[in-house]
Structures are given as structure tokens and as C-alpha cells.
């Protein structure tokens, strides 16, 4: 029975990949705009414009962007497109909306009714997350506050009624929390308190966005961070059978039901709120268990494509050699997925079943 269930999930996921690729090729816009918040998994270049961000918090140099259409680094922590890009494409856009800090006062006003990306690599749910590691980041507090100024411009331009209608039909895509967990994992002072605080912070920001007009939320939970190349270098006695850092994976796994419960409660509390929660832990675990299917073939699940040293976990830059085939690597650098994985993640968020996305997928969310 277990084998039959696994086979069914493999077939279902392969089918959804085919459906999503077909949709991407011919789909008109399903929503008026997409607004993106979060960390380096969805940053498209905001950190390029922060003077106090160290190199660890930037991706505006080779080899980043080698597979982007321009073959140039953009600030995405990827060899090409990231998950925000791929999801935006499935919703009918060319790619993620541009980074807020790349816009001028004039272009903000022309772009705001198409969508804007506020995400910042290194940031998290805590106001101080990322500062010790990468220096200056745009915290979630500042991301939401910046969006609030954009909403003011919308009201001035289109009036309150049209703006409220526009925002209620747009998608708000959020991927955050991993950096908070990375930093906390070195102390492990009180797991229960940490996770409760993490989810409470998430709830605070969601309510703030709701009161600014957001209604449709696409949220990605925290993946098994202990399996990233950077974390495979930690204490060997705490490594699991797959060579992953189990204490960090345990935290990631424990965070999901808390996040799911909070979202369910919040949707009952806030009239008109709808959400789609992607279970990133289950998604990544599924790929680990099924590295080769009819639609993908990952032959390297541990080492980064761009980097040197054990697991390629050090220094993705123009001096290090790249792997020969980016599409068969799970990880691009020490902490981020390849474009190939980001595409699978976005497709799963878009049309996945409740094994991976709850209570509805993003396509259903967009059509509400």
C-alpha cells in the first residue's frame, strides 16, 4: 500500500508539472498584480542597492545569473530565475515584478498596479535577523512599511474603492523564516518559545498586510534547512542518515503545523482572507526520495553547483568552477536551490494537491 501511495504521488506530481508548463506557455494574467515579500529565496535585486550589505548578502556578481536570459547577475540568489519568477510566470507575468529599490519615484507609480518585489536576502521575521551575517537588510517590518507607502500612492492615483478592489484580487507571495531559523539553531535556547515567536511575528505581518488591503496570500513554509550544503558541514554526530543536520530539520518540520494552525485561525478571524500554504518540507523531501522521474533528473542532491570545498559550501563567485549541468543539481550555492528546483516548487505551489499545498493551490486562490 505504501508503494502504491508513493507511486500515485509521483504520477500526480509529474502530471501537475506538465499541466503547469502548458499553462505557462499560453496563459493570460490570472490576477492584476503580484507583490512579493521575504528573503533571498525571492529577492530579485533589492540588496544590490543597500550600501551596508556585505558580499554574503548580495548576488550581483558572477556566477550568479549564468542561466538568466541575459546571462548576467541580477541580484537573484540563483543561476537563473527564482521561485517568485516562476510563480509569476504561471500567473501570466514575464517574471517577478521588479525590486522596489530599482524603481524611481516615477517608475514606482507606473509599476505599482502591476506588482513590486520587496524581498531582501538575509532578512527574516525578526527585525535584527541577518544583520550579523550580511549587514544591512530590509526587514519584514520595513518591507511592509514600504508597501504601505505604495498603497498611499495607489489611493492618490486611483481612489480608495478602485485600490481596495485591485489589492483584494492581487496575490501576495511570501517566503521567509529560514534565516531566523539558521541563526537560532546555533543557540537552541528554547525551541518552543522560538517557534511560537516566529509564528506570532508571521501573524503580525499578515494582519498588517490585510489591513493595507491584501486578501489573497501565497505562503511558503520553511524547507528542510539542515540538508543545505552549508549545514552539512556541521557536527557529524548530529547528522542524520541522509547526511543532513537533523536538529535544524527538526525545527523546520515542527514549524509547519504551527504555521498552518495560525493561518487557519487567521482566515476565520479576518473576513475575506484566503491563503495557500505550500509545504516546502514535504516538497523537498519528496524530491530527495524521488530524485529521478519522467520530468526531472537530479543526480546531485548534496553539493552546490557553484562553490568550492566540501559540498561546494564556500564562495560562489566568478573564480570557482561551475558544475557541468545545473539542471541535475538540487542546490545552486550553499543555501539556495537551482533554477530547476525553483521551477518545480512554483509549479507545485500553482497546481499541487493537498499533499503539498493547503487548503487550496495558487491557481485556485487566483480564481477565487
Predicted regions and their residues:
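Conserved active-site regions of diverse hydrolases
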Residues: 2-368
